[in-house]
């Protein structure tokens, strides 16, 4: 089994750095509750239960899978139920055990993401979905940080494929747009996230390179605001079409 990235090290701050704005999250959840009513749902990478907890509280049957015990412990404290610790590419479920499956911000962390899609297709009867942000924001601060550490000699790339790139491989069967939304962020909050190395791409950056990258970012962005507009897309594929994505991308 290829190595897996566990988010235990950032479990305590994960929700505050990865969650959607409350208004946007409420709209997405409302759409999902309507769509998933009466379905048995598998969430791979359930983590702290950002999606699973409110869906479960709304009466949706969600089974979660994860490898990070600390992330799941936080979810359990929030009311998360029905979690299995397992590898996403080797799911411990019978074929066609679920109506619907989902991943969100998971596949880019998994080098054998094609095997994960194959497993999702195996255990799912109907559809797979993910929530994608379509935005005019280009993550300026994070991109500047990445450019600075790369210029200093450190290069890192995600081992897998971002869910947001799946539609480029195969046209979705159905998209539910949610939004648009307009938000204002304080750059200081993002600077703090970067300084704490909350993103997996930062975890192995040498200390000196990290420190030197943060200095010009603080000087440029401290005290400023970042505004952006975005729409969320709840994007669905029929289970059998995941096989097309997985097999067409085999090296």
Label every PLM stretch briefly.
Residues 42-44, 48-90:
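Class I SAM-dependent methyltransferase SAM/SAH-binding core
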Residues 102:
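A conserved beta-strand element that flanks and buttresses the S-adenosyl-L-methionine
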Residues 105-109:
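Short catalytic micro-motifs in class I SAM-dependent methyltransferases
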Residues 114-128:
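A short glycine-rich, Lys/Arg-flanked "PGG" loop and its adjoining helix->strand segment in the class I
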């Amino acid at each position: 089994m290829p190595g897996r990235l566990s988010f235990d090290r950032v479990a305590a701050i994960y929700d505050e750095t990865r969650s959607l704005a409350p208004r946007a999250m409420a709209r997405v959840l409302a759409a999902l509750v309507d769509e998933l009513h009466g379905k048995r749902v598998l969430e791979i990478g359930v983590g702290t239960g950002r999606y699973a907890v409110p869906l479960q509280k709304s009466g949706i049957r969600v089974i979660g899978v994860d490898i990070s015990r600390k992330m799941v412990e936080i979810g359990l404290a929030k009311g998360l139920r029905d979690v299995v610790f397992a590898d996403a590419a080797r799911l411990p479920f019978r074929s066609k055990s679920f109506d619907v499956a989902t991943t969100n911000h998971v596949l880019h962390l998994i080098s054998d993401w094609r095997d994960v899609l194959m497993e999702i297709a195996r255990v799912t009867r109907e559809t797979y979905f993910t929530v994608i942000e379509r935005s005019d924001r280009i993550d300026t601060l994070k991109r500047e940080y990445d450019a600075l550490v790369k210029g200093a000699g450190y290069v890192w790339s995600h081992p897998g494929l971002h869910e947001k790139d799946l539609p480029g491989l195969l046209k979705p069967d159905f998209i539910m747009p949610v939004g648009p939304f307009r938000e204002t962020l304080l750059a200081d909050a993002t600077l703090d996230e970067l300084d704490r190395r909350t993103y997996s791409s930062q975890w192995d950056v040498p200390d000196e390179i990290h420190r030197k990258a943060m200095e010009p970012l603080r000087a440029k962005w401290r005290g400023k605001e970042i505004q952006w507009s975005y729409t969320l897309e709840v994007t669905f594929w029929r289970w059998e079409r995941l096989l097309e994505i997985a097999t067409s991308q085999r090296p």
